Every structure is written in C-alpha cells, then in structure tokens.
Amino acid sequence: MRGTIYVAIAILVAASSRSSAESDQVEPQQAPNSDFVTSDDTIYEVLPTRILRESRGSNDKLAVGAGDEERMMNNLSNGNSLSESLEQTTIKLTTDDVIAKAEEAIKNFKQLEPVLNMIRRKRQRIDPTPSNLGGQALHAPPNPDKSLVSVTENAPNVIANRLEKSGPTVIMKNAVRSITQHDYRPAPSGSSTTSAAATDIRLHEQPIARKGSELFKNIYPNKMVSNSVEHPLHMLEGNENSAHTVTVNGITYLMAQGPALGRKDTVNEEAKKIHEAFLKAFSLPFHQYPEETTHMLRLLRWSYNSSPNNINTATSLKDLANSQDPDVIMNLLDMDLKKLLGDGRSAVKATEKNLKEAYSVKLLIMYELFYDFCHGNRKLVGNLPSKSDRVDSILKVTT
C-alpha cells in the first residue's frame, strides 16, 4: 500500500513541476502553498491551485474550482482507488508499447519478405540429392522395386582370405566401412544430370583425368600412337581397341582411360554395353572403368573358377592391380583413395605396397557386385556358367 502511495507522490510532484513551468509563461494568481492533508499517517502536500491561461473571449483569469481540488484530495485519501487507477494506467501503457513494437516488427517483416521469398526460391532450385564420385550415378529416393545391396559382418575377413592375408588390414577395414555406409540405390532413368553413358566422359574432363593421361604418355612414350587423330590415347600395343569413344548429342568424346590390360582383354561393343548397364543398375561404391569391366567379364565366363571365392579369380584381380605403376594407381583410384587409405592422421601412407593392396581390395569388391549383377541379367550377359552358392561373401544383393 505504501509503495503505491509513494508512486502517487512522485506523479503529483512531476505534475506540479509542469504546472509551475506553465505558470512562468502566464503570470498566475497567488495561491496557497502550505496546505497539507493527512491520510494513513502520511502527509501530502497539496499542489498550488493551477491558474488557467487567459481565454480569448474573456479578460478574467479562471482558477481551478474548489470541486476539482476536493476530488483530487478525495482520490489521495482513497488508497485502493489510486492503486487501481495506477494499475490500469500501467496496463494501458504496456499494451500500447507492445502493440507499437508489434506493428514495427510487422512493418519490418513486410520489407524483408521479398528477400525471404527469393532465398526460398533459390533453395528450391538446389538439388538435395548428394553427388557421388567419379561420375557415378546420383543417389535416388528409396525405390522398393530396385535391387539393394547389404554388406556382410564377416566382410573384412573374407577380403583377407581372398588376398591370402593373416587378417584384415587397415585398408580392408576402411574399404568395408566405406561400402557399408554407401547407398547403392541407382538414379531413376532420365532424372539425373549425370548420364550412365557419359560416366567416363565426365571423369575424362576432370583435371585429374587429364593429368593421368599425360602421366600415361610419359610412362609409355613408345606405346602411344602419335599419328592417330581419332584415338590419341591408345593403350598398350595389342589393346588399341581399348581406347574407345562414345557419342552424346552428336559429339564424340574419348572415354577416360582405365588400367592397362593384357592381350586377352579388349574393350569391345559387348563389354561397353554391359558396362553401361552395370552403371545404371547401382550407384557404385567405387569408380568402375570399362577396362575393369572387360577384365571381370572374361573371368566371369571361366567354367569352374569364376566364383568370387575362387583363389584363381582373386589372383587374377590381384595380378591386374600389381601390374599397374603406383602413380597410375593413384590416378585410377582418384578420390577413392580416401575410402581405402583413410583420411587425416589415421590415413595409411600411399606407398607402392599399400597402393597395390588398395587397388586389389577395390577390384575384389567390385567383382563380387559385378558377378551378382551379371547372373541376375543373363539375357544381357550371355554364355555364363552356373552361378555358385557362396558361403562367405562381401556383399549380398537382394532383389
């Protein structure tokens, strides 16, 4: 109660100051300034009678009536009434302040609304689908009609056994971790900006691919066909047909060069057709070159040794990796190196031994996926032996 009364005194004193200021401009009549009134043991000084300004229609100066002064004194003596009045005034002031701030915020928002709409439109134009490495197909939304791939729990040990190691190495564990986290769902046909037919074109256009081509020229200067205009990047002698092209929108591109192959492997039209279908079937965990597909296709048609678990198949893939120069392997694996060697402080050094092991691991994983793909598409891939039932496997394709 006293707190309320103190507030009232402050308001009245302020009002008195304003009245005095106005009285200085128009000379006031003398009024008593020693009147006091007592309420609740508190003495209130009654403000001097306020003298009104001279009106235009009269020469008399009118003072505040006694009734007005009496009402003021009654209000001071009634604490509850004064408290309610102050509370209502405070609520009104607070409400007015909130409304004013809200109106200002709405005004500011309307000014920013065109900018916000522009940002929203830009976000809608951004494709939320994550891209993949090496020109592989982009991931698509879940489609139950497509084949999916799962990784077995024993995958690191299976890879170690095929490469005749005593146990999984860091490279093998890195590879399994990468393929476990990978999304194998392919992009819908025609919905992606990355065409499966142009997969290797994109890679060839990348600076690292051009660097690899130049490196190949430096390593095998005598194996290049210098006077060839159509195929300036022929491979080793006996594999001239491996340097192949593809036509997109009437423009012929030279496809990126993969590993050097032996005389038994030639990238022909059948191999290119199967390679393109393989790229469309999955979003591959590692980049796949047509040369690698060609070599795997030959192993796949072995009568008794085509199974991924067969020691002869694993040896052939390992020999392909070991026959490549370390610098060539680095260019072949490109960004896949991080998946195999690791990244940061825990990364394995890119020594010749580690690079060849990494490439061998990659080929083993991709061959198993290619094996299941081909046996699931016998109309596309003919002349295949019976599919073997694998007890141990790296991947499982569910259809």
From Swiss-Prot:
Stretches the record annotates as Disordered: 126-145
Residues carrying sugar: N75
Cysteine disulfide links: none
GO CC field: extracellular region; host cell nucleus
Sections of the chain in a coiled coil: none
Signal peptide: 1-21
Source domain of life: Eukaryota
Location of the protein in the cell: Secreted; Host nucleus
UniProt comment concerning the protein's domains: The RxLR-dEER motif acts to carry the protein into the host cell cytoplasm through binding to cell surface phosphatidylinositol-3-phosphate.
Family: Belongs to the RxLR effector family.
Protein name: Secreted RxLR effector protein 36
Species annotation: Plasmopara viticola (Downy mildew of grapevine)
